[in-house]
Amino acid sequence: MRVAIVAESFLPNVNGVTNSVLRVIDHLRRTGHEVLVIAPDTPRGQPPADRIHDGVRVHRVPSRMFPKITSLPLGVPRPRMIGVLRGFDPDVVHLASPALLGYGGLHAARHLGVPSVAVFQTDVAGFAESYGMGVASRAAWAWTRHLHSRADRTLAPSTSAMENLAAHRIPRVHRWGRGVDITGFVPSARDEHLRRTWSPDGRPIVGFVGRLAPEKHVERLAVLAARDDLQLVIVGDGVDRVKLQTVLPTAVFTGELRGAALAAAYASMDVFVHPGEHETFCQTVQEAMASGVPVIAPDAGGPRDLVAPCRTGLLLDVDGFECALPAAVTHLIAERRRYGIAARRSVLARTWPVVCDELIGHYEAVLGRRSLRAA
């Protein structure tokens, strides 16, 4: 099968969209499929992004920054995208978290008569609210409906996302979750030297991993930074870092980590907290659980499918999140081992090969649907 992936975000930007696309590329190549990636270039004034990734051609389009919409550059589609796709001759077009560039990819796919699978991964309407643009939420949903209703199939990563899409009259929605690297994220990566570096006096470590952007609501962890009986660690980087370093003056900020360093950071935490409620899936929750770390998250969005309350972690009411957080952390620190073992066990069947095989099944389904239409 020849698969063209139109990715709204890709390397050198590292986030949930990029990471899932990288996993899909790897699995497709390992299973004998051919792949083309269409993705944003770096903004003007920055070094150009790679045109080849692991042997796969990456066609780059110009990008622009839209600070009132997202902290990431957005790809601007060009008419020649049709020619790029025609030259590759794909069997299916995979739209990864489509927005501006994804819409261009969808238009090109429809023009060429190629079936498309749109992966809903970013809650743009929720993000708009986080950026102080509540009025834009309805417009964001109108755009999402306009785009996804034209795809042959929309894939949502969680029950909450499926319900949200259905409530906004988006058709042909199916479930496709995310895998986790259970050999990379492991409890045995716990590093006592790293823990002493973060917390020299041995206080329990509570951590967050993710992009430091308004929609993540990392500032809600201020109620923990004020405590003298634990150490807060923030892993990641982004536009809010300077502000958060002021709001969380006692926290350790590591910057962005990858690979073994990221695995060690997860496993070296005693409790993982994700404070934002606009996650369609929340991959960092799953990675923390694979690392044997109990999780606290809002009772909203993707974490509802991932966290089993009072077994693998705790889900807190969104409106009372900050009030309930200190007691929840204290409870999980006391019961860390029991919760951590259960958290690890809960993700062992969610490997990337299994999940990516499910994705190929969705590709085959839209190909079959198109064949039936033609007949």
UniProtKB/Swiss-Prot annotation:
Q: Does the keyword Transferase apply?
A: yes
Enzyme Commission no: 2.4.1.-
| Enzyme class (EC, first level) | transferase
Keywords, comma-separated and alphabetical? Glycosyltransferase, Lipid biosynthesis, Lipid metabolism, Phospholipid biosynthesis, Phospholipid metabolism, Transferase, Virulence
List the GO cellular component terms.
membrane
GO BP terms: glycolipid biosynthetic process; phosphatidylinositol metabolic process; phospholipid biosynthetic process
One annotated GO molecular function is: mannosyltransferase activity
Kindly indicate whether the keyword Methyltransferase belongs to this entry.
Answer: no
Q: Which residues cross the membrane?
A: none
User: Gene3D superfamilies, per this entry?
Assistant: Glycogen Phosphorylase B
Q: Give the record's pathway.
A: Phospholipid metabolism; phosphatidylinositol metabolism
Q: Which PANTHER family match?
A: SULFOQUINOVOSYL TRANSFERASE SQD2 (PTHR45947:SF3)
- Role, per record: Catalyzes the addition of a mannose residue from GDP-D-mannose to GlcAGroAc2 to generate 1,2-di-O-C16/C18:1-(alpha-D-mannopyranosyl)-(1-4)-(alpha-D-glucopyranosyluronic acid)-(1-3)-glycerol(ManGlcAGroAc2).
What family does the database annotate? Belongs to the glycosyltransferase group 1 family. Glycosyltransferase 4 subfamily.
Name assigned to this protein: GDP-mannose-dependent alpha-mannosyltransferase
What organism is the protein native to? Mycolicibacterium smegmatis (strain ATCC 700084 / mc(2)155)
Gene label: mgtA
